[in-house]
Every structure is written in C-alpha cells, then in structure tokens.
C-alpha cells in the first residue's frame, strides 16, 4: 500500500557512524521522526529504554514474535532486533516521515514490504578507520571488535542492494549527504503525489 509518509532505512557496519548521523539529521530536520527498534541486547553506556531501543527480555521478545508484532526481526551479533509493524505503519499512514536504523537483513526485508522505502547504507572510508572507531568507542573487548570487523565484510557486501551509499569520512559532509537524500526523496514525483494527493487531484494530474 502507498502511504503519504516516507520511510528511510539506514544500515551500516558497527562503527561506521550510523547512529551519530541519524541523530544529527533529526536535529536539523524536525519533520523526520525516529522509529525505535526492539532488542534483547543490554543497554550500552547512557542508552535509555524507549530512546535508542526498547530493551526486552528474550521472553518479551518471543511474545512479540508470536503476536506477529514485528515488521521484521533478525539475529545480529548474538542478539535479536525487531521493528514494530504498528509503529511504522501508523506514522507513515498519517503522512509522517520516519527514519529507522537497522541491520542490512532487516532493511532488505522492509523493502520487500514497503516498496517505496528508501534504503541508505553508511560505509567507513577504510578498514583502518573502522577498526580505529570501534577501538575508540571503548565498548567492546578485542575479541568482540574482531567479530564486528568480520561481520562488517558480510554487511558491506550488501551495500549494492541499497538505493544510496554514503561514505562517512568527514562527518559534516556525511550529514549533508544524508539530509540531501531525504530532501530529494520528498521532491520525487511519486512521493509528492502521495503526500500532496489533493493538490494533484485538483490539478488533474494522474
């Protein structure tokens, strides 16, 4: 079904800067709303329930799966992540633009359901920089960092499945690129026709 709102789906390997870019975009564009995913992993640092993620027990997550409450869900780095079907559909059905941070598996699955979803992949400028960012983050052991780098090879190979790719070398430039993608999507004929349906009908544009 065509909804008037736009759905932007952002994926990246750990350490590429996805969350920082999305946060910066939302500070610049108040018209875009975050879609908060559910996860079984524990909070990191200053993360809060309902802000970065809804943190669930495995049993709570199982219950949502059984109720078919997730648009998609997947195993990522040893934990489960899911996207609430109701949260997404309600917002874009009311003309809201929604941005979702998710893994590449979930992004591709969402595109199958919402064909108008805009998939954006964030790449690091190099393997060396990706390793350095993971180390500077200070959240993972050396063993976990190596696992994340190994998984990153698989994840980045899927960038070809996405509509847009941003290389996050200079943060300010990457934010500009992300904002440009959002603005350009809103001006596409198909997006304008969905968002401004009454205007198109009044102008007799099919």
UniProtKB/Swiss-Prot annotation:
Any one GO cellular component localisation term in the record: cytosol
Domain named Guanylate kinase-like: residues: 5-183
Catalysed conversion reaction: GMP + ATP = GDP + ADP
Pfam hit, one: Guanylate_kin
Keywords attached to this entry: ATP-binding, Cytoplasm, Kinase, Nucleotide-binding, Transferase
Subcellular location per the Swiss-Prot or TrEMBL entry: Cytoplasm
CDD domains cross-referenced by the UniProt entry: GMPK (cd00071)
Secretion signal, residue range per the UniProt entry: none
Keyword Nucleotide-binding: yes
E.C. designation(s): 2.7.4.8
Annotated GO MF terms: ATP binding; guanylate kinase activity
Residues reported in the UniProt entry to bind ATP: 12-19
First-tier enzyme category under EC: transferase
Keyword Thylakoid in record: no
The family this protein is said to belong to: Belongs to the guanylate kinase family.
Reported function: Essential for recycling GMP and indirectly, cGMP.
Protein name per Swiss-Prot or TrEMBL: Guanylate kinase
Organism the protein comes from: Polaromonas sp. (strain JS666 / ATCC BAA-500)
Source organism phylogeny: Bacteria, Pseudomonadati, Pseudomonadota, Betaproteobacteria, Burkholderiales
Gene designation: gmk
